[in-house]
């Protein structure tokens, strides 16, 4: 556990961010070193051509057929804070408006339509998950809802809404969070802000509240009926804590505004940028002049397991409240819960950030995984393999590649990259399914600028080796190999959940579930690499699963305890 808030090496590392020339430390055996000339920027969406306003988050749909070059075959779905869901259509290069929300947003608020994630089986069900601010006579909340697009993915059916999760808030927050991302297991990760404004320096009712979903990273497993289950190994497992004092959805607590998050697609390590205080310090004193420069702190955080990341008692490399023991934080007596249900008085141990950042606004990018099997003429080279990329909303062209230790506890190198590529107010930075990088540049609060855009960063060099291949996520790999026989599509069974399957096929496949008597229970069809859930296998017993694709057929014997 990283629990020392007086470790000077952290600050020294953060201050030394530009010690090396761009890309100079990123090498790969058998390939030439990278230069700025190896990368090209393609503008997909721009303010001038497409009349976008306050773009926020994006999600991708790969249209390339197996074996086909993925370049130019990725649809980009994105949200605009003031209420529009839009899509860059890669076939026409046009920007479509799929739907529009009539939102109630305070004048100084950062609330609105924020996060977006496409369902793991989006190809067949056309489900899209959205994070937005909802207000009615009886409810003010952040909603995570599932909607259905039409068959052409050109229109959002507003009547199809299934409210998956509703988080009570006050209206007018400047810290909404809003990031959504599915992992390979079908779990949905959600970054929620602490629902405060900059002057609310000490929010006991949200970030440190174990019984509240604000100021957290949540992990849930959406189900076809619009409800969700709780994955194994969240922070507060059922039965371990006093009833009514914790929420099982919480994976990470003690965050201020986890505005961006990403997941290592293999190890499922969670990384996020936590936006730190800039209006007041933790004791409510104004931060201005020289004090702002010395007190301001951001965090790049990494979690290999659930935990408490300390806010508001700790921020960056600083303890911000006297008398709080990081090994056993206790909510101060007489604290005001502001009408929200109180949680535990004694909190899990506080974990220090892996990278305190004394700059402006921490935005995480992806942990990149090179895939030698991906046919893409624009995918990033293996020089970035397993690197964690980050940027800064307020720092023009500040982009860095972090090298992580094998256990994910330390950053061993931080190298500047893309120094000549315009990262203008980035609010989302992801690796697309084509292996290229995508960046959303914000327009400014209730304003527009010439730099408002969504860009794609293409690699134009010639380093595209066959190895490494994209590794299979750990739990899927453990389930595979001992589960069945035959040459059919690769299939992994995810333990400890509903019957959830990760299928990898070169084309169209079919799945059939039977009981031991041969009675058909369920069937599904899909194409390529997909995640499939079979709700029909709900009770304990032994089942047979038949999988057929272009590779052949195989049968698996499954035991449900």
Regions found by a protein language model. Name each.
Residues 462-505:
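Residue-level detector of functionally pivotal "anchor" positions at catalytic/ligand-binding pockets or at interdomain
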Residues 25-199, 260-272, 276-279, 359-407, ...:
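Acidic, Gly/Ser/Thr-rich repeat motifs that build Ca2+-stabilized beta-propeller blades
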